[in-house]
Amino acid sequence: MARIAGIDLPREKRVEIALTYIYGIGLTRSKEILARTGVSPDTRVKNLSEAEQSTLREAIEKTYKVEGDLRNEVGQNIKRLMDIGAYRGLRHRRGLPVRGQRTKTNARTRKGPKKTVAGKKKATRK
C-alpha cells in the first residue's frame, strides 16, 4: 500500500483518484501532480513502482501544503478572523453561515438539528 503524506492510498484505485484521498488534493491538483511527475493517471496504486511513489511523495511535499499543515493553516485563519472581531469571525463563533446565506429558514447544516422552543399555548374555549 502506497503511503503518501501520511495517508494510505487505496490499492485498487487509479492513482488519479487515489491522490484525492489526501486532504488538500482534489481531482484537478491530482492531474497536475501526475502531469508534472510523468506518472500515468491510469496506473493502479498497487502497480506503482517505488521510484514513482517517491517522485509523487517529493512533488507533493515540496509544492503543496497538505493534511495537517493545511488543516492548521485553515484553523489559524478562522481563529484570526475571530480574534480581530471581523464579521466572518463572529459568524464562525456563533456557528452560523459565514457567506451570506439566509438563516430564517434553512442553514440547518451549520446550526445543527432543530431545538424546539415551547411556544404560546392555545387558549381553551368555554
Curated annotation (Swiss-Prot):
The keyword Transmembrane helix does not apply. PROSITE patterns: RIBOSOMAL_S13_1, RIBOSOMAL_S13_2. It holds the Pfam family Ribosomal_S13. GO terms for biological process: translation. One of its GO terms (cellular component) is small ribosomal subunit. InterPro entries: Rbsml_uS13_C, Ribosomal_uS13, Ribosomal_uS13-like_H2TH, Ribosomal_uS13_bac-type, Ribosomal_uS13_CS. This is Small ribosomal subunit protein uS13. It comes from Deinococcus radiodurans (strain ATCC 13939 / DSM 20539 / JCM 16871 / CCUG 27074 / LMG 4051 / NBRC 15346 / NCIMB 9279 / VKM B-1422 / R1). The gene is rpsM.
